[in-house]
Every structure is written in C-alpha cells, then in structure tokens.
Curated annotation (Swiss-Prot):
Its main location: membrane. GO terms for molecular function: proton-transporting ATP synthase activity, rotational mechanism; proton-transporting ATPase activity, rotational mechanism. Belongs to the ATPase B chain family. This is ATP synthase subunit b. One of its GO terms (cellular component) is plasma membrane. It is found in: Cell membrane. The chain crosses the membrane at residues 22-44. The gene is atpF. It holds the Pfam family ATP-synt_B. It comes from the Bacteria. NCBIfam families: ATP_synt_b (TIGR01144). The keyword Transcription does not apply.
Length: 175
C-alpha cells in the first residue's frame, strides 16, 4: 500500500494542492501587488485625480463664462434700453423743437400780416385824406364859383338853394 506522502504526491499530481508552490506564488503575487501599487496604481490614481481636477476646473470655467455671458447680456439689454430711452427723448425733444419752431413761424406770419394790414390801413387813410382834401378843394372852388355867380346876379333864396343843390350833385358825380 501506499504511504501517506505517496498519497499527497498522487493527489497533487492528480489535481491536488501543492502548498509550497502556493505559498511561493502568494508571496510573489503580494510583491507584484506592492509593485503595481507603487508603480502603476499610484501614477494611475494621480492621473485620474489630475483628470478629475481638470474636468472640475473646466466645469468651473464654463460656469464663469456662462455667468459672464449672462452679465454681458444683461448689460447689453440695459444699454439697449438706455439707448432706446435716449432715442425717445431725442424724438420728444425734436417734436418739442418742431412745435416751438412752428409756433415761431406762425407768430412771425401773424406779425407780418398785422404789419401789412397796418400799412394797408395807413394807405387807405392817406388816400381817404387825399380824397377829402381834393373834395374840399373842389367844394372851395365851387363855393367861389357859386359866390361869383351869386354876386353877378342876385338870386332869391330858392334860386340859391337850387344852385347849391346842383353844385353838390355835380360834386357827387365827379367823385
């Protein structure tokens, strides 16, 4: 029969466990893990942290850019509103100036019309005075003529009245 060690060897050769090999493999595996941790895992984790920081910074930068864009948009909207208000004020000022100028033109035209009216009235008055003067001259000459005819012939009161009325009618026709 077989001894116990033979059975272990047979078991190991058939698929059993070989403890000394396993311990050596475990030792080397732990060394491999330590080396991987030091040379691979550490740099890999530092790269991952670096990448995480980079992404976080990019997100923060994007947020800042978005905030700046919003602020610029608000500023532009405020400027646009201010420009609109200024343009509206300029339009209102132009309307007011136009109304003022319109009133000044109307006032000037009225003053000119009043001046022309006064000049026309003065001309009419002068013509009236000349006509009255001419009429007075005519009446005076007729009065002299009547007086000379009266002197030439003595007339009755009726004849004198008739003569005066005739001369007045003549003066009225001469006008």
């Amino acid at each position: 029969m077989h001894s116990y060690i033979d059975l272990l060897n047979i078991g190991a050769s058939v698929g059993g466990l070989r403890w000394p090999d396993m311990l050596v493999q475990l030792f080397f595996f732990l060394i491999l893990l330590a080396l991987l941790k030091k040379f691979a895992w550490g740099p890999l984790m530092s790269k991952m942290e670096e990448r995480e920081n980079y992404v976080a910074n990019e997100i923060e930068s994007a947020e800042q850019s978005r905030a700046e864009a919003e602020k610029a948009s608000k500023d532009a909207a405020e400027q646009l509103n201010q420009v609109k208000a200024e343009a509206q004020k300029m339009i209102e000022d132009a309307k007011a100036a136009g109304a003022k100028q319109e009133q000044a033109i109307i006032d000037s035209a009225r003053e000119e019309a009043d001046r022309i009216k006064e000049a026309a009235q003065a001309d009419i008055q002068n013509e009236k005075e000349r006509a009255i003067q001419a009429l007075q001259d005519k009446v005076a000459s007729l009065s002299v003529l009547i007086a000379s005819k009266v002197i030439e012939k003595e007339l009755s009161e009726q004849d004198q009245e008739k003569l005066i009325n005739e001369y007045i009618q003549e003066v009225g026709e001469d006008r």
